[in-house]
C-alpha cells in the first residue's frame, strides 16, 4: 500500500525537525522552504517562498496533506515583519492547497494566540510561580480560551486559526 503524500513547510525548523523522523516512517514526506531541506531527495525538496503563490502550487500538486509550520516566529516582530510570511504567505498556503486538491492542511499555531491572557489572574501568578495567590481550582486554558494575542506574532497565529476555519467550512480542507 502506498504511503500518503505529506508536505511540511518549515521542516528544518524546531517543530519540523522534531516530527520529521516519525513522518518519514509513516508518509512519503516532502518539504517546502526557502533554502531546501537537508537530506531530502531533490524531487521532494521544494524550494520557494511563501509569498510566491506559484511556487506553492507547484509544490502542492499531488499532495494529500500539507503541514504548515513555516513562519516568522519572532515574538517581538512588528506588523511589517509578520505581514509577508505569517499573513499573506499563510493565505497563499491555503489557497494553493485548495487549487491543488489537497485534502487536509494542518496549521501549526502557538500559545501566543492566547498569550495575552497571561496578564490576568490567575495565569499571571502561575507564570510568576506565585502559587500562594492562586485560588484552586482555576480554569485551565484550552481550545475555548478567548483569543487574546501577545503581540503581532500572536495575531498572525490567531489569524491562521481563523483562516483554517474558513477553508475547512467552505472548501472542505
Task: Name the predicted role of every residue range.
Residues 4-26:
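N-terminal Rossmann NAD(P)H-binding glycine-rich loop of SDR-like oxidoreductase domains
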Residues 9, 32, 69-70, 105-111:
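SDR active-site strand-loop-helix element
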Residues 27-38:
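Conserved glycine-rich Rossmann-like NAD(P)H-binding loop of the short-chain dehydrogenase/reductase
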Residues 37-38, 47-85, 96:
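NAD(P)H-binding glycine-rich loop region in Rossmannoid oxidoreductase-like domains
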Residues 80, 84-91, 99, 103, ...:
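Conserved internal alpha-helix in NAD(P)-dependent oxidoreductase domains
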Residues 92-150:
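Conserved Rossmann-fold NAD(P)-dependent oxidoreductase catalytic core, especially the SDR/UDP-sugar
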Residues 109, 161-173:
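Conserved beta-loop-beta element that borders a ligand/cofactor-binding pocket
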Residues 152-159:
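Active-site helix of classical SDR
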